[in-house]
Amino acid sequence: MKMIKLILLLAVLGVGTTAAVMYSGVVNVAADEPHSDFVYWILEETRKNSIKKAAANIKVPDLTDPELLLSGGVDYEFMCASCHLKPGQRESDMSLGLYPAPPNLTVPDNNDDIQVERNNFWVIKHGIKASGMPAWGKTHDDQRIWAMVAFIKRLPTLTPDQYQVLTAVE
């Protein structure tokens, strides 16, 4: 009986504390103020593990087709570059204004395994809540999303001139 009372007391305290935090306004949700290291760690680990689990069984097609690179480049230019940058670009108004900051996809990550491609596909298709990353799967089919994944895979190796050629609209 004492154990049940203790569990009930802890549950009431947990709900009460949660409600107090939610309704007091003490948590700063401003995008220009970073989370504490602890909160950031919790959110980042949750994000990484959620994507990894959701993307684990995605079958990756051949991403070496030049047509994929070209069509993915055009979409990247119009849909991604303002946040994830272009070769030679260090920051943009969008990359500076978003929190958490979007990853700079022009920088090599030295991680060329198939899980990265699966993760990129899943993130592009489904987006990430409360991050500014849209779910492009609502408006783009899988082939178009794979084209963006193929382009992103090559992006860190591109010069600004190569980028211009691959992202030019005909």
Language-model segments: which ranges?
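Extracytoplasmic electron-transfer domains, predominantly the class I c-type cytochrome c fold
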Residues: 97-153
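Low-complexity, rRNA-contacting terminal tracts
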Residues: 156
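Extracytoplasmic/periplasmic copper-protein system
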Residues: 159-170
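Sequence/structural segment immediately N-terminal to covalent heme-attachment motifs in c-type
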Residues: 66-89, 120
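Short cysteine/histidine-rich zinc-coordinating motifs and their immediately flanking basic loops
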Residues: 92-97, 163
